[in-house]
Amino acid sequence: MAKKVQAYIKLQVKAGQANPSPPVGPALGQHGVNIMEFCKAFNAKTQSLEPGLPTPVIITVYSDRSFTFETKSTPAAVLLKKAAGLKSGSPRPNTQKVGTVTRAQLEEIVVAKQADLTASNMDAAVRTIAGSARAMGLEVEGVN
């Protein structure tokens, strides 16, 4: 018989830097999960990623206090800020542009996020990421 799911926990943890301090410790502790076991497994799984990039993770906690987790790709906003060399997006994205990204940079981001995007082809995925860039106040070159 399959294990009974007790909870789903969604967190953003920096790649390779999971530790028992907040937000990881309290979120897992209230469900009785072994926090150090999660931290070691997460850090091992994300060691190939660039250290410090926020990585969304969905943790499934079962009634016997065991768990599984699935990592997602880094949020598009973080990758866009990194590509444009910014600390944050524009406070007024429609009127005040804060940086520029090219189509080549957008294609790199699409390749990194391919598994989490629902677009059917590269052009549609680039347009999706370009929309996120415009919403952050970035100017997009080479995409209509």
Swiss-Prot record:
Keywords: Methylation, Ribonucleoprotein, Ribosomal protein, RNA-binding, rRNA-binding. Gene3D superfamilies: Ribosomal protein L11, C-terminal domain, Ribosomal protein L11/L12, N-terminal domain. GO terms for molecular function: large ribosomal subunit rRNA binding; structural constituent of ribosome. GO terms for cellular component: cytosolic large ribosomal subunit. One or more lysine residues are methylated. SMART domains: RL11. InterPro entries: Ribosomal_uL11 (IPR000911), Ribosomal_uL11_bac-typ (IPR006519), Ribosomal_uL11_C (IPR020783), Ribosomal_uL11_C_sf (IPR036769), Ribosomal_uL11_N (IPR020784), Ribosomal_uL11_N_sf (IPR036796). Forms part of the ribosomal stalk which helps the ribosome interact with GTP-bound translation factors. Part of the ribosomal stalk of the 50S ribosomal subunit. Interacts with L10 and the large rRNA to form the base of the stalk. L10 forms an elongated spine to which L12 dimers bind in a sequential fashion forming a multimeric L10(L12)X complex. This is Large ribosomal subunit protein uL11.
